[in-house]
A protein has these predicted regions:
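Phosphate-binding glycine-rich loops and their immediate beta-loop-alpha structural context
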Residues: 1-59
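Short, ordered loop/turn segments at secondary-structure junctions
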Residues: 4-5, 35-38, 62-63, 80, ...
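Loop/helix-junction capping segments adjacent to catalytic residues or to phosphate/diphosphate-binding pockets
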Residues: 13, 40-41, 65, 119, ...
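Short glycine-rich anion-binding loops that position phosphate/pyrophosphate groups of nucleotides
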Residues: 62-65, 113
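Short Gly/Thr/Asp-enriched flexible loops that form oxyanion-binding sites at enzyme active sites
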Residues: 66-78
């Protein structure tokens, strides 16, 4: 936990606090299950227990291909894994499934472990599901077309979200400027940004001045 001394091979748990804050903004009652050990049985039993008293389960980490990544296995044993991995960046190793609880199928979203990937996949993938489960009809945020103040290339067939800030050019025209680093572990990049630019699967190149789809954080955080 933040504030405690870390030991070798440990990192601070930022995701739990970020997710709880984002969920509470959506009016959710959050039941925090804490940090789980890298133990297959413990993870399975914690997910089973959580499914009995909650309408949606949300995890972060433990969903990649490491020896200690047991979340996918637990989902399959307790219910069904509907998909694992999407052609997106950041957040490729996201998974969605359900856990059987008597006569209910409780949805579970297994988010990646990197802080930026967690926040981006929550805002663009998990958030609409939370709103849908809450009875909301308007589950998709508004995007705005704004000229880019950057150039970038990307892989065709993959959807990407870039962290950007609003800037003014010499003519006082509003543009979006890309955060200089792409690492999924740089949480400060989210704090320093005004929103996300979404590049669809068919886009392979953005040149400075091109119109891009801009999602202000105000659309998904308020």
């Amino acid at each position: 936990d933040p504030g405690e001394k870390s030991h070798s091979a440990q990192i601070f748990d930022i995701n739990r606090y970020s997710l709880m804050s984002l969920l509470k903004k959506l009016g959710c009652k959050v039941n925090d299950m804490g940090i789980l050990p890298d133990d297959k049985d413990a993870i399975r039993e914690s997910i089973r227990s959580a499914s009995r008293n909650n309408d949606l389960l949300l995890t972060s980490g433990g969903v990649s291909m490491g020896e200690e990544d047991h979340v996918r296995t637990a989902i399959n044993e307790l219910g069904k894994l509907h998909f694992w991995k999407l052609l997106i960046k950041p957040g490729r190793p996201i998974a969605l499934g359900h856990v059987n609880d008597e006569d209910r199928e409780v949805p579970i979203i297994a988010l990646p472990g990197n802080p930026v990937a967690v926040m981006v996949t929550f805002l663009r993938i998990a958030r609409p599901l939370v709103l849908l489960l809450s009875g909301s009809v308007d589950i998709h945020p508004n995007y705005f077309s704004i000229p880019s103040a950057f150039s970038v290339t990307k892989k065709k067939g993959r959807r990407e979200w870039l962290r950007v800030s609003l800037v003014r050019d010499k003519g006082n025209n509003l543009k979006v400027k890309k955060f200089p680093f792409d690492g999924s572990g740089i949480l400060s990049s989210m704090v320093s940004s005004d929103g996300l630019v979404e590049l669809s699967e068919d886009i392979v190149k953005v040149t400075e001045g091109d119109l891009v789809d801009f999602l202000p954080f105000s659309e998904v955080l308020n």
